[in-house]
Amino acid sequence: MHKLLLIITVFSTFNVAQASLTSIVASVNDKPITFNEFHARKKMIMVLNNVENLTSDQDKQLSDLAINSLIDESLLFQYAGDREIQQDEIDNAIKSIEDRNKMPHGSLLQYLKNKSVNPESFIFQIKSELIKMNILSSLSRSVQVSNKEIDVAILSSDQKDVEILMQVFRSKDGSNKAFTKMNYLKNRLKKCSDVKKTLYDKFATMQLITSKLSKLGGVKQTIVKDLIPDKASNVFEVNNKFEIILVCSKKILNVTVDENNYVVNFLTNKKISQKAQKIFKNMRKKAAITIMFPS
């Protein structure tokens, strides 16, 4: 009997040791992520997405999603350092989620509890999202959008007509020599205001044209649309002669203040997102991350 108890004790000790080894599923810069945190996050994701039964492949995907969300969360908390997320920020975030889902205020956490989800896992995720929003907010102060970027974005939408002022250079003949000279001219065209007649008058003519983009012929419309002011096109052939277009100015027509503001906000958010992604990518790249849970 004494031997049997000893064997049971040995096996019990072995199981406890195994449990302690598997209680940590990952570490981020020596900060542990426990199995309980991992399990709670999986459960939370399942409940919030109304998922009940999983195939083995789906369970693996869910495990990857849960562990990666916890790793990102840990990195964000470490990035924030001593900066505390205030309780009223958390409460307002939860109320916002409840409003979007048409839930009474104060019911979301209780709903999670009723589904056997640890509310702390949800609150930690809320905190990490608030840290992320603070990062985005700080980035917004360093982002600027130029008029040129706004014009390019509006032009690319093909929803507005554009008034074009351009210089069109046309060779006097279609010889190889004329083609060579036109290429040489193209490389010297920098700004409309700097163009002198002596640059081209021996082998080409120049016509100053004002036109709406929509009124230009197919080939010219395509070429001009892609050109920015004071940028010369490549040499192209028209009716056995060679042409170059140098755009002097572009004026987008009939853009309202609201439309302009929409484009500015879109471009600003895009730049902020790109900067944020770079920060988050660098967080991961520089971190010492170890995953001990089978992926």
UniProtKB/Swiss-Prot annotation:
Pfam families: SurA_N_3. Keywords: Signal. The keyword Signal applies. Residues 1-19 form the signal peptide. The keyword Phosphoprotein does not apply. PANTHER family: CHAPERONE SURA. This is Uncharacterized protein RT0667. It comes from Rickettsia typhi (strain ATCC VR-144 / Wilmington).
